[in-house]
Every structure is written in C-alpha cells, then in structure tokens.
Amino acid sequence: MSARAGIVITGTEVLTGRIQDLNGPWLADQLLELGVELAHITICGDRPGDIAAQLKFLADEGVDLIITSGGLGPTADDLTVATVAEFCGRELVLDEALEERIAAILRRLTAGRNLSEENFEAVRTANRKQALIPQGAEILEPVGTAPGVVVPGSPGSPTVVVLPGPPRELQPMWLRAVDTEPVRRAIAGRTVYRQEMIRMFGLAESGLAETLRAAEQAISGFDRLEITTCLRRGELEIVTRYEPAAADAYGQLLDVLRDRHGDAVYSEDGSTVDQQVAALLAGRRIATAESCTAGLLAARLTDQPGASEYMMGGIVAYANTPKAEMLNVDPVLIAEHGAVSEPVAEAMATGAMHHFEADTAVAITGIAGPGGGSTEKPVGTVCFAVRAEGASITRTLLLPGNRSDIRERSTTVAMHLLRRALRGESD
C-alpha cells in the first residue's frame, strides 16, 4: 500500500472564503510527485478544538503524514503549534537559539522604523511564542518570522509537518521538510506514479464522457488508470495518474482520444494554449483590438514570459467612436452591420495591425450582457477576427454564462483561433 497523507488548512479567513486556499492544491501536487497518496484535504477555523478534531480525523483514517498550513504567527489566534504539540503528546519548550534567530530577523525587518530599544523588546516579546517548539521536533528555518516544525510520528501515529500560511513561506519550507528523516521515514512506502495531462478544446463534457465509457470497455487495464476530468476556461483537462506498469493502457487511451477527437486535442504534454501561442509568436509582431473583453486578451498574451518580444500593443475600443477614430473602422460598416458583426471585427483587426505596424492581429467584439442583447444578437454573441501572414479566420459564436464567463470564454476562443492561424490554418 502506498504512503498516505492528509492536509489541514487552518484559518477562519480561509474557511469563510475571504482568502482563497492556494496551499492545499500546491501541496497536493507535491505529494503526487513524491508518489504519496493524498487521502483528504480539510479546512477549519483557528479554534484549537477544531484543529485537534481534524488531526484526530486524519489519524483515525490511518494516514502516515499530516501537513498543516497556517496559525504560526505571534498573535493570540495562532495556536496550531500548541495544538499539534498536545495532539502528539509533547510539551512545548522554548528554543533559545531559535528565539535569537527570530529576534535577528525582526531587527532587519524593523531597521527602517527607528524603534526604540524598549519598543523593539515589546515586538520581540510578542514574537517569542514562535520559538516554542514541541519537544523532540525538528525545526524548519523560517522564511518570514514563523518557523515550521516536523513532529516525528510513533508506531501507529502519523508524522506531522507544521507549515506557515503564506505560500511564499510555505513552499520553500515544505521542500526542506521533505529532506528530514521523520518525513522520509513516513513516506517510505510511497508508490511511484506517472501523471499525464491532455488538454482539449471544442468538445462537450458529455462527448468526452461517452468516449471514456467506450474506452473502459475496449482497453485492457483501463481500471489501472486514475482519470480526472475538469472543465476550465472553456477547455477540458484530462489528468491521468498511473503506475509505470500501466503505461500501455494509457497509450491506448491516448490513441482513442486522437482517433475520436483529434481536432479537439491540442495538447498532450500539459502545455496550455497560452504557452503554445507564445512559442508560435516567436519572430512575429502582434496587436489586439478589443471591445467586450476590454483588454483581457492583451493581458493574457502579456502574462507569458518574453511577451515584450512580440506584443506591440492593444486598443480597447468599447464605443463606436474610438472604433472609427483609433482603428479606422468605417462608420458606414457599423451602421450597416452593427458593432457586433464579422465585418466590424475584421476591420478592427486590420486597423490594429496597421496602427501598431504588426503582422498579426486579433479582434473581439461582442455582447457580454446582462443587457444589450436582441432576438437577432442575444447576450453571448461574440465575433472574432484573426489576421496573420497567410491566414485569416473569422468566427461568430454564442457563448454561455454570465458577463464574466462570456468575457473569459471569449479570450479562450480568441487564443485558440490565434493558435490555428499561427499554424497556417485559415477559413
């Protein structure tokens, strides 16, 4: 049996949704890479009783390793270390050397504030609780002021890794925790897995579900594949986890997906459409013209490292006047076809290309709602135009969802149309 782990995310601000949990998903990926099976992720508030209940639940589930996140600060509600110590049956002891290191960090952090020695000592006293460590625990040196700890397990009880809440502190400290003897011992029974991700666009979830049902009947060893599907940004992600001995079954699954949905499969190595477009734009100059997406496409293009090599600029022409004045769209064209139309989208793309002296351009114009729709052009109607050397693509789609959904899906569609054009495909 593979080593098993559980994660406890603490913090009332996370429990109530004021702060999004980023640590659970990141730690889950780390455990997967190590070959450790993740049994549970739980979220609880700052009350010691709630934290203790989660620890007991995971221990009763028989996990080998528990990782906690949050509650290591100097304030009164930061009680994770004390709760873990009690759970593990260990006393809290002041590590004087650690307390000195924390004090040195505090001096650096307060150097520019001209604190008197008396005021600094007050700060130091408030942070002294961070140097209280469960007896026998290994210390993980702090990135901020909060150290982490690794409390070794005993026969029949899990090892507990206690990490801070801020991801920039947690991530490097987890990497140190993995190298400690208690953690290595806890995950000694891990199983090596492979994980592959396929990305698809233009296929409904129901179509994929039907294909997977057929594959289950046709592929020997299909039951050895752990398949998870997720709809994200209008795309389908298929994540498959398997032991190396099941590689042949995964290869057969890939063949089935290619045979049935070759046009929809755009990534077999997990690369995103944004990454692929960035690679295809090497040596090119691109410009954008946006109406309903109001710069979201330009932002998405420039999210990629090295975007300054190919991104010339973008124009948000939300109203008709800037479409005419900045993109040179003929007002007669707008009057005849409407601002949301393929001819106007094409003119916007051409205008952006000329304005920025680019060789590639993408234009989006649509009705994101909630108002502005009509029987002929309901909310969700979006027109796209892509112009690239040797390729031209124009599309009109009716996209589902609310205003935010439509705007985000529009950028995804635009990225895929751009990818096709850069690969030489055209209408």
From Swiss-Prot:
Record-linked SMART domains: MoCF_biosynth
Signal peptide range: none
Matches recorded under Pfam families: CinA, MoCF_biosynth
Family: Belongs to the CinA family.
NCBIfam families registered for this protein in UniProt: cinA_nterm (TIGR00200), PncC_domain (TIGR00199), PRK00549.1 (NF001813)
Annotated protein name in UniProt: CinA-like protein
Native source organism of the sequence: Mycolicibacterium smegmatis (strain ATCC 700084 / mc(2)155) (Mycobacterium smegmatis)
